[in-house]
Structures are given as C-alpha cells and as structure tokens.
C-alpha cells in the first residue's frame, strides 16, 4: 500500500514536465502537418493549372478568337511562378529543423512576384465569368465545353469552367491562412516565429493590394468603354443629376481660372500626360504618313505601261515589259500585302489602343474637379456625404492607376512603334533586293553598267540638272510668246468671294485651282477645280517652294504650286457685262463665250500701259509717260501694299501707283512662231 502511494506521488511530480514535453511535441506535429498540407496542396494546384493549359485550353479552339485570352488570362505566368515556388518548398524538406524558417523566407522572396501575376488574373476574372455565362446560353457549346472539362478534370463536376477559373483566386487567398496555421504551431521563442509573422503579414498585404488593384481596374473599365450612342440616346441620358454634376464642375473650374481657389498640382501626372500626348502624336502622324504612302502605292500600281502597245518590236522595250509585268504581278503585289499585314494593321491597332487611356485622362480631369470640391468642403465643414466620399475615392483610385500604369503603357507603345518602323524599313529593303534580283538579267543592256556607284550618281545628277535647265528654258521661252492660259469658269456663288479676295490682296495675288486638290496633311487644303484663292506665301515653313500657302477667304493652308495658275483678265468685249458686278473697271473677270468653229478668231495678248504720266520723286520710283508700255514685276510693294506696283520700262525698274496702270489688248498677228 505504501509502495503504491509512493509511485502515485512520483507520477504526479513528473506530470508537468511530461505535459510540457507532450504539448511541444503536439505543436511540432501540427506544424509539420501544416507544412505538409502547404506542399501537397501546392503540388495539386500546379497540376490542375497545367491541365487547364494543356488538356482544356488546347481543346477549346472552337471558341471565338480572343475568348481564350480572356478566360485563361495570364495563367502561363502563374504556372511559371508557382513552379519555381513549389521547387523552393520541396527543397526545404531536407532541413526539417529549419524548414519553417526557410518557408517564411521563401514567401517573403516571392511576395512581389505573386502579387504581380495574381493581380492581373484577378482583375480579368469578372470578364471571364461574363463569357462563361454567355456560353451557358448556348446549350450545344456548353455541352461540348463540359465534356472536355470532365474528361480532363472529373472533380470539376457540373460547375465546369467556373470551377477551374476560380482556383487561382482561392489559392492566393489561402496562402495567408496556411502561413497562419504554421505560425500558430511555432513556439514564440523559435527563430522561425518572427520570419513567419512577417511572411503572414506580407501575404495579407498582397491580397489587400490585389483587391485595391481590382477595384481600380473596375473604375477604369467603366470609363474606358467607347459607346457608340446616337444623339437621341445621348439626350435621353441627360437628367437633373447629370446637369447638377456638370454645373458644379464648371463652377469649380471657373473659380480656379479666376484665382479664387487653388488648383491641385501633380507634377508626376503632368509629366506622364505630356509624354503620353507626345507618343499619341507620333502614332497619329505615322498612321497618316503610312496612309498617304499606301494611297500613292495604289496609284502607282494602277499605271501599267507594260500593258500598252509601244510599237517597238523586240529589244530592250520587250524586255522592260516582261520585267515590269513580273514586278507588277508578284513583287509589288507581295509587298503591298506584307505592308498591309505587318505595318498598317498593327498601326491601326496601336491607334485604337490609345483611345482607352485618352478617355481615362479626360475622365480623371472631371474627377479631379469633384475631388477638389469635396476637399474644400471637408476643410470647411469637417464631414462629407457618402456620395462625396465615393467621388473622392474614385478620383484617388483613378489617379493611382494612371500614375502606376501610364509609364509602362508609354514604354510599350514606343516599343511597338519602333518595331513597326523597323518592319517598314525591312519591307522596303526586301522589295529593293527582290527588284534587283529580278532585274539582274536586264542589267547587261544598261549603257552605264560598268560605271562605279559614285560616278553613276554624279552622272545621274548632271543629266537631271541639264534636263531641268532645258525644261526651264523651254518654259520661259514659251511663256513669252504664248497667249495667257484660259481661266477656268468660276464656281457657282463664288463671285462675292472673288470680290473679297481681290479687294484684300490685289490682282497679282489671285490664283485659280486648275485641278482637284486632295489634302493629305493636317495643314493641307482640299479644293475643287476652279476655286479662287489668294497667295500668301510661295513656300512652306521648310522653304519648299512646291507648296504654297493660300487663303480661300475662309480657310488658310498649303496646296501644290503646280495646280495653281494666275487668274487672268478677259477680253474688253466682255467688260461691259462685267461692270454690273460692281468691280473696278481695271479688273475683269473671265466669262466663257460660246465658240464658233466656222469663224476663225485671232488670238490676243494683253499689255500693261501707263494711263497717266508719272514723275518719280525718288530713286525707288520710275517716271512714265502716258501710254508707255510697262512690265509688272510685283503688284505690291515690299510691305505688301497693293497701291504701289514694281514695274520695268525701257530697261529700268521702279515703283509707280497701281491706279496709274491699265491693261489694254493687243492683237497678235497670225502665224506667230515658237522660239527657235
């Protein structure tokens, strides 16, 4: 009996130590079980993701184009990160004593990568669900999708696609719970405890950041949608709330412009917006230039001289026709197709991609006005309504999203733009190589084939220079003897415009469009044949004298100089009817007369004479006698004043009053000859 009592007392004295040891062993066991659960579930999770990409996504090619990208989003990036993460988890198994510590460090190491890949997937999840609901409305398609999923993942059940798509969301939210479970079974004095605490907090922050990013993307998606609404639909959306909101914003803007309230300054956003606008301008200009290039290419391909009968049998002409036909049907056609597919279509897609950020930036300015008004009220009153607080958060979310993603967007657009330009250059080089390769057999017929490239370039420049000089000489010679070109009939209702331009600029600046002009640039004008314009400058801002700056009386812009001719006066026989228009007698508008083929007419040429005598008062002026013929060099002085004209008479030049001059017709004798 005494021995039994002694043993009982001994067992009671040892029980606290045994209980402590048993509790520690139990916590360690639970910790290892939690770690095992983390690793095993990660293996199963990664296996399911790989099934989604290989056995399911690969067999859903019957879905509309682009749907697979929305459904599975960036699942490939998630698989890549999870594979490396699982490899790190499995490597910790060989060090059981430090395994919990190593797992905590591993989560901290992968914190940023996990957030980056999962936030993209979670932000696109709602759009994927909308597609799933759309498929459910098509029984045949839904049955086919369900069969593919059940064959690959039987545990998906009737949920099918929805079951698979939600798995990544469940996984990222489960990481903090698994870490918390490991942390609870880790002694507070263990070295792994603070590391696990930081890892648990970090994964909780990851989930919070993902939720915040998803909310920002939802706000952005709301304002980046481009709706094609009719005027009636737009008017139907106007209500008292809309009018009140617009009025409040306008009032806030006017107070800022008047300096009554300060304007919120955000240099970071301003710099990003300026960069974005510059990038957008580059895309717009390149698209405009490529469009003009393709129009010119189309016009070039319409001309097919090799299909004409040149009446030159055999020889170089026949070989040229064969080469031109070959290039037209193969090389040029292939170049056009590649240009459309590799340059034009990507450029159009890039231009469309700019619309969303542009709308977002515009909406951000509206929300900024709401935010500033709410901030003022918060300072004055100390509280705001629920709607005002929501408007405040909307601006903050929108601004944070733009500031975070616009730099990356600008960088991607510039990369895309550079790739398009490089592709365009490569296409040009390929076309040149292809043409040279096809023309190699014809090069033996060229007279200068043995000349070096620098010498050939100089020879070409000299030949073109001589031809240009000869053509200029011919033109000047013909202009001296040919009668003035017949002006085109005025457009209906343009008499008043003609009167206005003539009064403002004088007759020496009035030109008429000889053929239709289609403007291609932002500063180019589109004008019909017969349009009257006034010359402002005979060159553009780059000094190019083939583009003239003109005034139509309503718009100003550039037109090709070759499609303009000086507006000439008409015969005196038409002067009498013309006086009824109220114009001065010295200027006559052309009126077309019916031609009479049976009665030959004598061509007339007009000359300018001095109507009154004029005595020069300085060396800049020229003395004239009444009836003395003169040549008008400029119908205005150096300041553009049309009241004085620069003339030449008897080899001398000087200024005379413009109203002292008049044009008189002089008949040209029959049989006038061309210059020899």
From Swiss-Prot:
Classification via InterPro entries: AH/BAR_dom_sf (IPR027267), ARHGEF37_SH3_2 (IPR035636), ARHGEF37_SH3_C1 (IPR035823), BAR_dom (IPR004148), DBL_dom_sf (IPR035899), DH_dom (IPR000219), Dynamin-Rho_GEF (IPR051492), SH3-like_dom_sf (IPR036028)
Chain positions covered by the region annotation Disordered: 1-26, 568-601, 657-676
Domain SH3 residue range list: 506-569, 603-666
Short name of one Pfam family: RhoGEF
CDD domains registered for this protein in UniProt: BAR_DNMBP, RhoGEF, SH3_ARHGEF37_C1, SH3_ARHGEF37_C2
Species of the source: Rattus norvegicus (Rat)
Endpoints of the signal sequence: none
Chain's role: May act as a guanine nucleotide exchange factor (GEF).
Protein name per Swiss-Prot or TrEMBL: Rho guanine nucleotide exchange factor 37
GO cellular component: cytoplasm
Domain BAR: 254-455
Listed SMART domains: BAR, RhoGEF, SH3
Ranges of residues in domain DH: 30-213
Entry annotated with the keyword Iron-sulfur: no
One MF annotation (Gene Ontology) recorded for this entry: guanyl-nucleotide exchange factor activity
Classification via PANTHER family: NUCLEAR FUSION PROTEIN FUS2, RHO GUANINE NUCLEOTIDE EXCHANGE FACTOR 37
Keywords: Guanine-nucleotide releasing factor, Repeat, SH3 domain
């Amino acid at each position: 009996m005494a021995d039994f009592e002694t043993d009982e007392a001994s067992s009671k004295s040892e029980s606290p130590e045994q209980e402590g040891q048993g509790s520690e062993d139990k916590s360690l066991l639970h910790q290892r079980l939690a770690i095992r659960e983390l690793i095993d579930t990660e293996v199963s999770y990664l296996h399911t993701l790989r099934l989604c990409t290989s056995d399911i996504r690969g067999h859903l090619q019957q879905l509309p184009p682009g749907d697979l990208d929305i459904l599975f989003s960036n699942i490939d990036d998630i698989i890549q990160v999870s594979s490396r993460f699982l490899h790190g988890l499995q490597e910790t198994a060989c060090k059981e004593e430090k395994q919990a510590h190593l797992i905590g460090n591993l989560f901290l190491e992968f914190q940023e990568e996990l957030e980056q890949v999962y936030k993209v997937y979670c932000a696109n999840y709602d759009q994927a669900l909308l597609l799933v609901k759309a498929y459910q409305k098509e029984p045949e398609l839904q049955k086919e999708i369900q069969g593919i999923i059940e064959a690959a993942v039987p545990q998906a059940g009737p949920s099918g696609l929805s079951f698979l798509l939600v798995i990544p969301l469940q996984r990222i939210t489960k990481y903090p719970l698994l870490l918390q479970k490991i942390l609870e079974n880790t002694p507070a004095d263990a070295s792994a405890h603070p590391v696990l605490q930081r890892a648990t907090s970090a994964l909780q922050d990851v989930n919070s950041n993902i939720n915040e990013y998803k909310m920002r993307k939802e706000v952005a998606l709301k304002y980046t949608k481009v709706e094609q609404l009719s005027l009636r639909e737009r008017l139907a959306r106007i209500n008292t709330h809309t009018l009140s909101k617009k009025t409040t914003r306008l009032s806030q803007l006017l107070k800022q412009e008047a300096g009554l309230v300060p304007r919120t300054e955000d240099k970071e956003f301003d710099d990003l917006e300026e960069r974005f606008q510059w990038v957008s301008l580059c895309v717009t200009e390149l698209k405009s230039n490529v469009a003009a290039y393709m129009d010119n290419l189309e016009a070039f391909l319409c001309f097919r001289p090799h299909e004409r009968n040149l009446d030159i049998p055999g020889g170089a002409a026949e070989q040229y026709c064969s080469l031109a036909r070959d290039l037209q049907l193969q090389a040029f056609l292939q170049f056009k197709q590649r240009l459309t597919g590799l340059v034009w279509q990507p450029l159009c897609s890039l231009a469309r991609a700019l619309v969303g950020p542009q709308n977002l930036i515009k909406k951000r300015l509206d929300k900024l006005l709401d935010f500033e008004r709410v901030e003022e009220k918060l300072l004055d009153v100390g509280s705001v309504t629920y709607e005002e607080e929501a408007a405040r958060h909307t601006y903050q979310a929108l601004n944070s999203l733009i500031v975070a993603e616009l730099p990356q967007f600008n960088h991607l657009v510039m990369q895309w733009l550079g790739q398009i330009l490089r592709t365009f250059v490569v296409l040009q080089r390929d076309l040149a190589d292809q043409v040279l390769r096809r023309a190699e057999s014809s090069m033996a017929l060229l007279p200068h084939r043995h000349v070096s490239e620098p010498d050939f370039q100089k020879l070409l420049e000299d030949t073109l220079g001589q031809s240009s000089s000869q053509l200029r000489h011919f033109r000047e010679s013909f202009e001296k003897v040919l009668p003035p070109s017949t002006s085109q009939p005025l457009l209906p209702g343009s008499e008043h415009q003609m009167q206005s331009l003539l009064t403002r600029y004088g007759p020496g600046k009035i030109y008429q469009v000889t053929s239709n002009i289609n403007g291609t640039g932002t500063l180019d004008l589109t004008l019909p044949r017969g349009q009257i314009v006034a010359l402002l400058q005979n060159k553009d801002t780059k000094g190019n004298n083939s583009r003239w700056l003109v005034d139509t009386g309503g718009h100003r812009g550039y037109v090709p100089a070759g499609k303009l001719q000086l507006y000439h006066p008409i015969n005196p026989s038409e002067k009498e009817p013309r006086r009824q228009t109220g114009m001065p007698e010295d200027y006559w508008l052309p009126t077309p007369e019916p031609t009479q083929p049976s009665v030959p007419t004598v061509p007339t040429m007009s000359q300018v004479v001095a109507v009154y005598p004029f005595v020069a008062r300085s060396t800049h002026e020229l003395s004239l006698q009444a009836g003395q013929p003169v040549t008008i060099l400029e119908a205005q002085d150096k300041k553009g004043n049309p009241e004085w004209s620069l003339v030449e008479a008897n080899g001398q030049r000087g200024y005379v009053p413009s109203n002292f001059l008049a044009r008189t017709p002089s008949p040209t004798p029959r049989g006038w000859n061309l210059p020899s």
